Each structure stands twice: as structure tokens, then as C-alpha cells.
From Swiss-Prot:
SUPFAM superfamilies according to UniProt: beta and beta-prime subunits of DNA dependent RNA-polymerase
Gene Ontology CC entries for this record: DNA-directed RNA polymerase complex
Protein name stated in the entry: DNA-directed RNA polymerase subunit beta
Transcription keyword on record: yes
Keyword Transcription: yes
Organism the protein comes from: Bacteroides thetaiotaomicron (strain ATCC 29148 / DSM 2079 / JCM 5827 / CCUG 10774 / NCTC 10582 / VPI-5482 / E50)
MF GO annotations: DNA binding; DNA-directed RNA polymerase activity; ribonucleoside binding
Subunit structure and binding partners: The RNAP catalytic core consists of 2 alpha, 1 beta, 1 beta' and 1 omega subunit. When a sigma factor is associated with the core the holoenzyme is formed, which can initiate transcription.
Keywords associated with the record: DNA-directed RNA polymerase, Nucleotidyltransferase, Transcription, Transferase
Record function comment: DNA-dependent RNA polymerase catalyzes the transcription of DNA into RNA using the four ribonucleoside triphosphates as substrates.
Segment forming the signal sequence: none
Reactions mediated catalytically: RNA(n) + a ribonucleoside 5'-triphosphate = RNA(n+1) + diphosphate
Amino acid sequence: MSSNTVNQRVNFASTKNPLEYPDFLEVQLKSFQDFLQLDTPPEKRKNEGLYKVFAENFPIADTRNNFVLEFLDYYIDPPRYTIDDCIERGLTYSVPLKAKLKLYCTDPDHEDFDTVIQDVFLGPIPYMTDKATFVINGAERVVVSQLHRSPGVFFGQSVHANGTKLYSARIIPFKGSWIEFATDINNVMYAYIDRKKKLPVTTLLRAIGFENDKDILEIFNLAEDVKVNKTNLKRVLGRKLAARVLKTWIEDFVDEDTGEVVSIERNEVIIDRETVLEEVHIDEILESGVQNILLHKDEPNQSDFSIIYNTLQKDPSNSEKEAVLYIYRQLRNADPADDASAREVINNLFFSEKRYDLGDVGRYRINKKLNLTTDMDVRVLTKEDIIEIIKYLIELINSKADVDDIDHLSNRRVRTVGEQLSNQFAVGLARMSRTIRERMNVRDNEVFTPIDLINAKTISSVINSFFGTNALSQFMDQTNPLAEITHKRRMSALGPGGLSRERAGFEVRDVHYTHYGRLCPIETPEGPNIGLISSLCVFAKINELGFIETPYRKVENGKVDLSDNGLVYLTAEEEEEKIIAQGNAPLNDDGTFVRNKVKSRQDADFPVVEPSEVDLMDVSPQQIASIAASLIPFLEHDDANRALMGSNMMRQAVPLLRSEAPIVGTGIERQLVRDSRTQITAEGDGVVDFVDATTIRILYDRTEDEEFVSFEPALKEYRIPKFRKTNQNMTIDLRPICDKGQRVKKGDILTEGYSTEKGELALGKNLLVAYMPWKGYNYEDAIVLNERVVREDLLTSVHVEEYSLEVRETKRGMEELTSDIPNVSEEATKDLDENGIVRIGARIEPGDIMIGKITPKGESDPSPEEKLLRAIFGDKAGDVKDASLKASPSLKGVVIDKKLFSRVIKNRSSKLADKALLPKIDDEFESKVADLKRILVKKLMTLTEGKVSQGVKDYLGAEVIAKGSKFSASDFDSLDFTSIQLSNWTSDDHTNGMVRDLVMNFIKKYKELDAELKRKKFAITIGDELPAGIIQMAKVYIAKKRKIGVGDKMAGRHGNKGIVSRVVRQEDMPFLADGTPVDIVLNPLGVPSRMNIGQIFEAVLGRAGKTLGVKFATPIFDGATMDDLDQWTDKAGLPRYCKTYLCDGGTGEQFDQAATVGVTYMLKLGHMVEDKMHARSIGPYSLITQQPLGGKAQFGGQRFGEMEVWALEGFGAAHILQEILTIKSDDVVGRSKAYEAIVKGEPMPQPGIPESLNVLLHELRGLGLSINLE
């Protein structure tokens, strides 16, 4: 684009960063795309997102397996309304989700039942806009990604009160029961199922198939089997028994209920385990008839496994059957019906795919942790997993392994939007499949179709409650583009399934070494959420398992691979133990290190090593920070706490009337604007065909193939938003920065405004600042402003507020919008139109009527006589009351827009007119579709000319164009393209691809026409779509122009915030030697203790830039040095460090000391005094205490609290104090008497009893105490 639309910047980066920034919204957009997989043909869809949810819930069969409902495919239709329509009308921007379902019968008795394939509507699903937001009930919302504990196995330790270390292993699945293995102070290992049921771990091992002690001990290679005979027994005297010696026999008894003979196996313990074998035992063993006995092995690591022996001692069971029974009783507190049902319960706990799911992540983590090679498809626990976990736990006890660090990012993963939606869908579909099954069972004998089985409300109610009430679905912060993009890249540890503020300790909130390049160590809120909400780093990505990855360059033999192949994205786990060089380590052209020692990072350590030892290198010094922190120039010179405030306050910067990009930037500003999607950008290469204040049209370049398969014109029109309101009542008002005939490339930014200038982020203004005290007015961070800033509207912003009023039908009758309001003067309604809505351009003052509405009064129903009289004389005033919308006490502004939406209220004639109109609309649609199909058939004929069909099939697999036949126009005319398989029509791959694209574009265009038809019909028959129960809705938009004034909050980018304390006349401000007055005076004492020296660097470089007309980019940790500053100040002819002697504006004399005078980028923040200032004389009172309410929203009073009372007592001001505590507060009688006295000019009456005393008396009487005032 031309240089007049792009800011050229001098870049100080020493590392010319070859790695492009990733798309900053990829986190959200890619996740949602993977959830729907709309661009992928059904047969190639991955088993994730929505497809996976369908695959897991279908096929659904009835209880007798007679009918089966199978899932074939899903698709979506275009949305009915545009995003803007939805925002205006308070609707949800959603698309209809439809599924192709197949219902068939397997029962031979139902021969008459044909297989049915139907497209079934499953409800609307909110659709993500290209800005990665959702429009829910007219408001833009963002679904924040959640950081939670990854499924898998975790090893931890705790310390018992007596000082013993207790170890535990916990297996966390995606779905199913938690199981924990833990040791106790007696060195016994227990398994806890779902955190409550406790059983010895050996009981669990028996139940899963290691039936006897021998099997259990052999797992750990602890026992030796000895065959029982006298010789062998004599040889092993003195050794310990590893397992009990059991005598087994069968006992028969008669079951009294059935009369059957039942056999039962009985066990008797002859010798207990851990007994040392002596002579006396030999005969006992021989008599018991045991074939083998088990002895401990004499091995050095024997003692390591003492916990297994101790656990066997505690084990109440001796066989699998007993173990299964024991576990069943623990879980259910009852006896099982039979052995099989008990086994099934245990099997369902961990080994059933329906009930238990580790997920890909859980399996991956368990394999990685325990060095297993189990297949990734095995999503349930295996016996091997349980054994390996027990073995690892034993290693922990013996200090041969380490416990896991729960805050390590390999143990935390991200749930993105797509996954959260999948989980909600799974809940909705599970509910729906239950109702489908029930309906199938009920309708056994009748003929039914998939549509009869499905209730679309089930899914949409779950999805709606997720978007409406879930803690992670948030009202988007839309103060400026940075606030939007940061909100979408936020990672929250809160929310369902996450932590809670109260329980989160310091460790979870702390910065961890694995956050490097993944989560920003700087940007997090101050207050109770600190450390629980973080922001994704600039280069970070989230992989398919949900772990955060960051890029590095490979280093081999001391040489950095600077090619694209040398780039690797690593998770925290893959980065373990690696030695990583800094991003700004100096390199030679061939990629070798300049210095023979390299500063590097290895986990939490920072060794200085030889180049040959380095494994990886950072891609950029900015890798460590998030977008907001990367926007702070000279961040490396600021204290982290102030940088945190700086990055948080940039999100609160109000878009100004005229935006101005910073002189000193960091080079990331352009990418941020492009990726925020708040401006109009070119979708491809092309030429600007037309441009004015409201419209841009671009003619895009297209290849022949693209032109051929498309049904859209190459000319695309964009509407430029004007004075559009954001969620935070800021203004989006864009203007074009391209010219007619100009060539544009893909990604070029075509507009500016809403905190952007020439395609760069522009949150504030470059102001001339002096660091010096000024008459005490800038004490404690206060700011002194030059009046010029106010006069020239440098820091003026426009805020748009929307006010709406709804018309409903009440029990008493219909409400009505009108300018004819009872008991209101003509003066008050002079600006209202016939619908009672204020005219555009009217100035609004507090108390003015903005929308006039009357509503039927409800004292009593009128009698028939009254009704008759009213009908004759038309007396309406008596039965309605004024329900108009009036301006609140602080509202002043200008009406810039108004809208009225209404449902159609039908009378007979209008119904007839509609009847005539609807067929015309249908005919118009039919002819458009016929034209469209004609073009399609013509193009298909061109494509398939001379080619032979390879067999074109429909969804049922039936051939509709036979294999080997030639394609003909009549064949194509008769095809239903919506139910055709699009793969391999011909033997040529290129033609097949073109056919596929052509037919897909045809279907897309057809669906758009269909949606338009539905929209038109809806508009005629029903009118505007409005939320339920509302007949009309009027909206008024009021713009307020806010100049900066005393009490407004301002800040720089380094956490240097303050309140404007005085606006000083231009001639009274300190001025430079050439007579230029400074714009703003800041207190120099705000710098040293805050340690944000970056602001001084910025001021010095900014002034050099302003003098020379140059803009700079100084990337963080790689920016301008002191030498660079000196060089540029010398070039600009400024003193070193811009230490300048100023003159006093009042006297004209020069000050004694030089002060730093520079140009700093200052922001005006959203905390404006006009929104906060509030005063009241009389107003509402609390119902019970009769004291004035509190807060501006309630038009409340100021609390005169305990300490204020002490102050008046200290002065002895008894009368004032009495007045404040009685008639000015809650003495109800006194209030009215005082009013009377003021009106009549009489002296003030004596105050009465405050209401709060009466409340106290009532409370005491409520306790049964008889209390009276004498």
C-alpha cells in the first residue's frame, strides 16, 4: 500500500526476526473450526469435536434391538440474520444444525418397515463470527479457554502430623471414577475409589485377576515357589512364608428356598504369612494337602517392597471372589445379587469404554510417565497401568523417583472453545438419545421416521445455558482492539472443573519456569484473581492434546538452524532438561555463536555453557511476553509490578476522537490490528473499485478455475461501520484509508479509527511531558494538564449509549408507544415523533422523555357503563399511566440514531394481501434457483465433456449415473445435488476436485437463496423477530462527547497512572526556550520508587522522534540502547537525556534546575469522573430502615459513617450531628416537618425518633421482650 497509509518505523531490533507472528486469534478460530470440521468432507473428518460426539452416541437402538437409528453426516445451513441484525434485535447469531440420519429395522416381523434416510433439524447452534466472538441475545461474548489439570496419573506427597511422609498416586480420567493409591503411617498401601471408599491395594489386585498371594508377589518378583515334600521343606527351614498356607475343602448344603444342593468352597488358614518355618510346621503343611508353598526371596532390595507384605497382612480377602465381594460391599454397602453382577460393577469402574475414558491426553500422559507402549486407542485403564503405578509409588517411597510438580505445564492443559462446546453437546446428545430410546420402545408397532424421534429443544437448551450462564462464557471486553484480542487469548484456571479463588494457594498463582514462552509472567489481574487468569504468549500455540507449545530453533554442534526446518514447537514436557540459548545471543551469518560462552536456560536454572552443549535457541526475545506486555516499549527497564499495571491499563484506554499512533512503538502494533479483525482488510489481491465514507468495493483477482467454480461475483462490497456502539459503550467509527484504483494485497488494512491509525494500534496521544513538580498540583501521582489538550480535543472521546423500551401485552390490555402521554406538557413531548420516539439530532438533558409509552392502568376493571361512556366520549386518559423512558440524572447527549422493531399485528385485509404476496415470493425464488441450476448444469457439461462416468452415487449408495456411461445434460437436470456423493465422478483427479468445488458452491448459494426466502416470508407473516413476549421494541442511541477534565484517570504504558488534578491555561504552563508550553507535567517522584525507568527512555526517544518526524519500533528485550538514544538526541540537536531548562509560565523566569522534557504516549482510561460523580438532595429511601439508599445507580446518598460521627463529636458540633443522624437520614416525621418549615420560612422543628431505633425495638419485641419508650 502507499506510504501515506503506512507508518514507516526505524527498528532497533538486533535479531532480525525471521519468524512471523502467528495469527493471534488462531486459539479461538482453529478450535471452533476443528469442532465443526465443515471444510472437511464427511469421510475425511477426524474423530474430534462434534463428529466425535455423534460417533460416540450413535447408533441408537431400542431395548430389543429391533430398530436402529444410525448417524451418517451433519451439516449446517446459513444463518437467517446477519451479525449486525442480531446485535440490533437482541437475537443470537446461530446456524441451524442438521443431521442426516438413517433408521432401519432388524426385526423380520416388521417387513413393511422401509429404511428411511432423513435430514433432521437438531436445533440452532451459536456460530462463531470471524472475530472469534459469539453473539448471544444481542451481546458479543467470548468463551475463554480454561487451564485445568490434565487427565493422567499424578504422584504427590503429604506429611503426616507425626512427620511421616505419605505418598499418593491419583489417576484422573476425562470421564469416570477417580482412583487414588496412597500409603499410610503403618506403611500399608490403600486404594481409594472416588475419594471415599478405602480398600487395601492387594484386594484390588486380586479382583482384577491376580487371585492369590503368589500372583501378587510374582508381579514384584518377590517370591519363590517351593513344591511340598518332606525333603524340600527341610531344606527351607528358617525362611519366611510369603503367603498363607490355606486348607481348602468343598462343603455341600441344602438351600431351604429351592431344595437344591449347593456346593461352597471353604478356606482355613493353617499358617499365616510372615511366619518363620520351623519343624512343627512341616507336618501341618503336609496334612493340609497343599501342593506348593510360597517363600520370600533372599534379595537385597527385599526391604523396598515391605509395603506389599504389610498390605497383604491387612488384606481381608484370600481369593478373587472374596476380593470382588469385598469391593462391591465397600462401594454399594450391600451384597450383590450374584458373582457376575459384582464383577461387572468392578469392570464398569475402570475397564468399560462406556463408563471410563482417559481420553487421548490421559493415555498419552500415562504412557509417557510410566514408559508404557500401550496403544493410544486404549482409552480405559489396563492391569499393566495399575501395576506400573504401584511399582512407581514403591520407588517413590524408597526415594528412587520424584513426585510430580502439579504447576508444571505438562500437568495442566487448555480446554479451548471447541472442547467446551463438545462437552456441552455430549451432555445434550446423551439426554436426547435417552428420549429417542424411550420413543422407540413406545412406538414399537407403528411406522415412524427419524424426525418423530427427535426433540430439537434438548440440545439447544444445554447449549443456551452454557452460553448464558457458564463462568467461562463472558461478556466481551470491547473497550479497544487490544482489550478484545486479549480477552480472546485469556487462559483462566477458574470455572467449572477448575479452581476456586478461595482454595487457590500461592503455588498455583506463581510464575513457573515452564511458563516461559507459553503464559505471560506479566499480564494477570491485580486482586483476588492474580495468577489464576493469565494470557497466552505472543508465539505460543495450543496443540491437539491441549498443551501449550512454544517455538525454538534447533542447535546442533553449536550451529543454529535458521531455516524453516530448524523450527520446532515444544510442550513443557518435551523441553525438560534441554539447554536453551537466549533469543538475542549474537550469531554469525552461518548460524554459529559469536561468543565462546553462551548464556542459556535449563529448566529453572541459568547456566553459561559452551556453544556445543546448546540444544535449542529461543526464536525471539519477545517470546516470553503476551501481546499487551509486548506493546510496552523499553519493558526491559520497568519493574514487573508496574509493567503488569501498564499492560492492564492499555486495555482500558478509551478510543479517542482522533487516534494517533505512538512515536515510540514496539513493532507489533500493525499485526495486532490486522488480527483483531476490527478493521476491514483485503481478503485477497485486487483493485479498489469504489470508495466513499460508508462503502468500499474491491474487485478481486481470480484464477480461471476459481472463476469457473464460483457462483459469486468477483466484486465484493464492504460497509464501513459508523458510530457503532461497543459492549462498553465506546464508539466504532471507521474511515477508509485506501483510494479508488489502488492495488491491494491480501491482508492490507483498508480503514482506520477505533483506536487505530494507518493500520497500527493507536490507544492514546503523543504529548510533550515535563518531569517536574508544579505548585504541588502533581503531588502523589496527580497530573497537571495544558488547557490546549482540552481545547483541541486531543483527549476527547465519544461514547454511545443505547436505551430501549419494550411494548408487551399486559393483562389489562396492550401497551402503546405514543407521543400523547397523559399529564405531560407539550414542551416535554415536542421532540417526539408519532411513535413517541425522540427525533435524531435532539439534545437530551436529565429528565427528558426519550421514548413515550402508555400502559393500561389497573386500579379496577371498568364497569360496562364506564366502558360505554368511554367508547362514546373517547376518554382514554383515565385508564392509562405514563410508562415513558426518561433520561437519568447524569445523562446528557445527542440522539444519533433510533430504531423501531415490531411484530406484524394482522387484520383481515392485511392477511389477504399477504396471501397474494407469498406466492409471488415463491415464484421469484423458484426462477432464481432454476437459473442457478442452469448455470451449474452448463458448467458441469463443460467439465465432464468427453469423460466417462465412474459411477455417481447417492447417499444410499445407489447409482444415479451408471458407471461407463457418458454424462448428459438430462442426467444432471434430474439430479438432486444435495444428496449426491461428490467423490470420483471421473477418472481425472483435477476434474473431480473442480466438480466437488462447483457443486459445493452451488449448494452454498442455493442455501443462501433459501435463507433469503425464509427471511422474506417471516418479515411478511410475523414481522421483525423479537425475543418472546415482546410486540414492539424501540431503541434510541445517544452519543456523549467527553472532553478530558479534572478527576479523569490517565496513564502511560509503564504503569504510571494518575488523576488530572488541574487544567492550566496554556500561558501559565512551563515552556521551553523556544516558547513551546509543555502539554502535561508529571511528578518526578513517581519514577524512582516505582522503578519504571522505561518511561524516561520513551520520553527521550519520543522527543527525538517528534523533532525529526521519525517513528521508532523498539521491540521488548531487544530495543534501543543508551547509545542509540544518545545518537538520536544528537541527531535531533537535543541535550543528552533531554535535560532541558524550562521557564515559568507565570513569571517567564528560567527554573534553577534542568528537567527531563520528552514526548510520552499518554492514554485516557475508562474511569471517567462523569460516570462516577454523583449528588443527591432527596431521593429513594430503604424500605425498612428508611435511610437513603447507597450508590449512584440507586441515586443514593453519602454514608455518614462511624468515623465521620467521631469527627463532628471532636468539634462539638452537636446540632449538625443531630440533624445528620435524624432528619437528613431516617426520621420520617422530621423529614416532612423540616420540608414544611423550609417552605413556610419557619425555624427548624425538633427532630423525632429515627426509624432505625424503631427497627431495633421491633427486633427486641420479636425476641419476646416487652420494650416501650417512656
